Amino acid sequence: MISTLLTKIIGSRNDRTLKALRKIVKQINAMEPQFEALSDAQLQAKTAEYRQRLEQGETLEQLLPEAFATVREASRRVFGMRHFDVQLIGGMVLNSNRIAEMKTGEGKTLTATLPAYLNALSGRGVHVVTVNDYLAKRDAEANRPLFAFLGMTVDCNVPGMDASQKRDAYAADITYGTNNEFGFDYLRDNMAFSPEQRVQRPLNYALVDEVDSVLIDEARTPLIISGPAEDSSELYIRVNKLIPLLVKQDKEDSEEYTGDGHYTVDEKNRQALLTENGQIFVEELLKKEGLLAEDDSLFSATNISLLHHVNAGLRAHTLFERNVDYIVQKDEIVIVDEHTGRTMPGRRWSDGLHQAVEAKEGVKIQNENQTLASITFQNYFRLYDKLAGMTGTADTEAFEFQQIYGLDTVVIPTNKPMVRKDMGDLVYLTANEKYAAIIEDIRGCVERGQPVLVGTVSIENSELLSGILTKENIPHKVLNAKFHAMEAEIVAQAGQTGAVTIATNMAGRGTDIVLGGNWQAEIAQLENPTEAQIAELKAAWQVRHDAVLAAGGLHIIGTERHESRRIDNQLRGRSGRQGDPGSSRFYLSMEDTLMRIFASDRVTGMMKKLGMEEGEAIEHPWVTKAIENAQRKVEGRNFDIRKSLLEFDDVANDQRKVVYEQRNELLDTSDISETIHVIRDDVYGAIIDEYIPPQSLEEMWDVPGLEARLKSDFALDLPLQQWLAEDDKLYEEKLRERILDEATKLYAHKEELVGKEVLRNFEKAVMLQTLDGLWKEHLAAMDHLRQGIHLRGYAQKNPKQEYKRESFDLFTQMLETLKRDVVSILSRVQVQERDVEAMEEQQRQQAEAAPRTYTHAAADNQLADDEAQAEAAPVTFVRDEQKVGRNDPCPCGSGKKYKHCHGQLT
């Protein structure tokens, strides 16, 4: 009550914001006569003038009044439409990193031209984001004449464009496109093998239409680019036949040691490595099999994949044992957890090991779809320097926009007062009674010539209602969200006299329903219409328009409450545009999903006891309020899920930013030799530390082990034992320096042999390929970690903290593996100029040929639901011993009291 009184005295935050913006509107209006007096050429010259002033240090905010006045005057000349004052306010809100809630029919598309023009003056690009391709193309074409008049370029970014077309689209001052396409282009750019393959510029300003749909409804669903892990089934099988021909080399200290074995096994570190004899023998076998050219080596750059298959096959045969490490079940390899002995269906080893074991056991070799890159809309749109959005319904989600994106919501007043009549909900006992009442309402509308839009929560419900209307011989149209162009056409004519249109709640957004039908759409269907034809169509439309107004305007029928009030408000908002009359009513039954969950059997029983007869409905403001409270609960839960998922994804996002930043630096740098030098010293230093611990006694050194490791991993054949025997003063530090010097000399010799430029290009290619491979594996590892992390709740651990800790360990491990693998490959591979060209060509072909799957993945609710179950589960398990008190700490480990945490659910 005190809050209400204060608001009345000092006004709400929204009122104060609008008051401040109206002062700037007065400035813009004062400039209008001055801009009207300009010739077309003088008005067009303003763009160059503003750009020059920006370069001289003026800010966009300082230019705003003049820029908006310019766009308003240009729009009047090009379209014959002048921006209303409320549209100017909307434009200012959108320029200031905020969300503008503008009701249906208030001209959001025209409003967007104001901040789009202003922000495009910087030359850094503006992205106008829509929810489907049709709207992107429509808005780009609709606004192109205005922007072209002002000297701005406009383009549209849609699926199916090649790289050069996309590059042109992004080079435009203003680019229209869908949220999916902008996101996928960002991911594709971060998978490019050369700077020329990238299409996006740095992300400057995004203006998101239907912002609630993009940033809230689709926030849980990540964009994923995936591709099948290379199909090498045949290669695995052929290599598998060769492995049993190899002979294990005995340990040097055993009596049977002869030194002519083909491989060694280190069970402690789970490694199997080819000896020098083994390498020669395997090369001979591969040449006989036709897998290796006669003059080629297994260690040449183009045969890295073949070497990988040999190593995977060797490990599968020597380190992994059936019924110990895995079992064969239903023609599949199922991993056995080494700690628990339990099978882990669905889990697969990485690095091609699983396929190698499948080849060994003769079962079907499965290819995996590997995640190559992924990002959520939450994290993609937060990459922009400036972000703004507009929608007809944002106020109910204002808290979430502020919490997640830091965006305040401003409700823009309508140009004309809203006169739509929103009637109270009618609640029936059964769905059949509800549908009978809906049919009667529709029949009444048709008889008096009033158009009606019926909103359903699912396609299934819309088809059910369509079937009933067909039986009742009531003509109608059903919106199918699959065909956006058709959808807009149907919606545009949904205001015809007595028209009945059934639509799922989200269908047709972005297209206004004009009372009496859309006369412009009718004219567009004519070829070269004459002035007389246009006048005739306009006159006919005016008659229909007046008839619909007299019948009460567009009537909205909601067949069920959505779990979000915002979606219900969107449906209502289709009626009453620009001060037109209209009405809305929701019909509910106790069998509806929302009512079934939140209105218990007791309420249904009470309704029956009150003597409700069949076909009778309850209508009371209390009922409507109770339903809205139920919706608030669901909205709160969904917000918690999205926030929880964002906290998890933020961990991956931080890592993604680091990897993509490093990758882009790598692409833009021609010489990375200094980086390679630092990495090489790090890797050798770490290996030496393993065998010669720092500041340790000589008795603790494992010099033979270090010799063998340097030789097997880095092709560095150094007589360390001989050095130590010959030089008593060769202490740890000096030995370390000598090893690093020898490694540097060997690498310098390689550079002399192949040439500086060839080696620089090869270093870059190896670094990119290794980073991409390890990043893919890291994404898979993160997925596995995320799927099981909720189980930590059972151990009274916080799953989020555990996820952060373990994912950091995985990332650190990935970076260490990257350094080691890059140094190992560069040390062992024999580089030739043709190898570099072949490797780059191989990368290009793989990128172009690999069938990629672009998915807007299913909503990732499972993680949050699992986490909630895991956290709540201890309450269930310990109930027999001790009931959790309302004021006790919640067993989930959140630190909150039980009544404020999971106690709310009960």
From Swiss-Prot:
Cofactor(s) in the UniProt record: Zn(2+)
Gene Ontology annotations of biological process type: intracellular protein transmembrane transport; protein import; protein targeting; protein transport by the Sec complex
Localization annotation: Cell inner membrane; Cytoplasm
Binding site for Zn(2+): C890, C892, C901, H902
Catalysed conversion reaction: ATP + H2O + cellular proteinSide 1 = ADP + phosphate + cellular proteinSide 2
Region (Disordered): 875-897
UniProt keyword Repressor, yes or no: no
Keyword Membrane: yes
EC number: 7.4.2.8
SUPFAM superfamilies according to UniProt: Helical scaffold and wing domains of SecA (SSF81886), P-loop containing nucleoside triphosphate hydrolases (SSF52540), Pre-protein crosslinking domain of SecA (SSF81767)
A molecular function GO annotation: metal ion binding
Binding sites annotated in the UniProt record for ATP: Q87, G105, E106, G107, K108, T109, D512
Membrane topology: Peripheral membrane protein
PROSITE patterns referenced in this protein's UniProt entry, alphabetically: SECA, SECA_MOTOR_DEAD
Quaternary context: Monomer and homodimer. Part of the essential Sec protein translocation apparatus which comprises SecA, SecYEG and auxiliary proteins SecDF-YajC and YidC.
HAMAP family named among the record's database cross-references: SecA (MF_01382)
Record function comment: Part of the Sec protein translocase complex. Interacts with the SecYEG preprotein conducting channel. Has a central role in coupling the hydrolysis of ATP to the transfer of proteins into and across the cell membrane, serving both as a receptor for the preprotein-SecB complex and as an ATP-driven molecular motor driving the stepwise translocation of polypeptide chains across the membrane.
Family according to the record: Belongs to the SecA family.
Protein name per its UniProtKB record: Protein translocase subunit SecA
Organism listed in the record: Aeromonas hydrophila subsp. hydrophila (strain ATCC 7966 / DSM 30187 / BCRC 13018 / CCUG 14551 / JCM 1027 / KCTC 2358 / NCIMB 9240 / NCTC 8049)
